[in-house]
UniProtKB/Swiss-Prot annotation:
GO terms for cellular component: cytosolic small ribosomal subunit. Binds as a heterodimer with protein bS6 to the central domain of the 16S rRNA, where it helps stabilize the platform of the 30S subunit. Keywords: Ribonucleoprotein, Ribosomal protein, RNA-binding, rRNA-binding. This is Small ribosomal subunit protein bS18. Transmembrane segments: none annotated. Belongs to the bacterial ribosomal protein bS18 family. The gene is rpsR. The keyword Ribosomal protein applies. Pfam families: Ribosomal_S18. GO terms for biological process: translation.
Amino acid sequence: MARFFRRRKFCRFTAEGVQEIDYKDVATLKNYITEAGKIVPSRITGTSAKYQRQLARAIKRARYLALLPYTDKHQ
């Protein structure tokens, strides 16, 4: 019987020693939003609570400044 090995999630920002998540770094922020434009929860990404709050704030600022879309579901 095959057992599935689930890889341990870790916070990328803690591992890299990031002080503050920058709202102008759109390439990084795009990794943490879905195709529909929603913010991916930390239980999926493994981001720590401190950086999840910074991430949410940075994504919301980038949306407000039109660096990121609020949604991609325009028809």
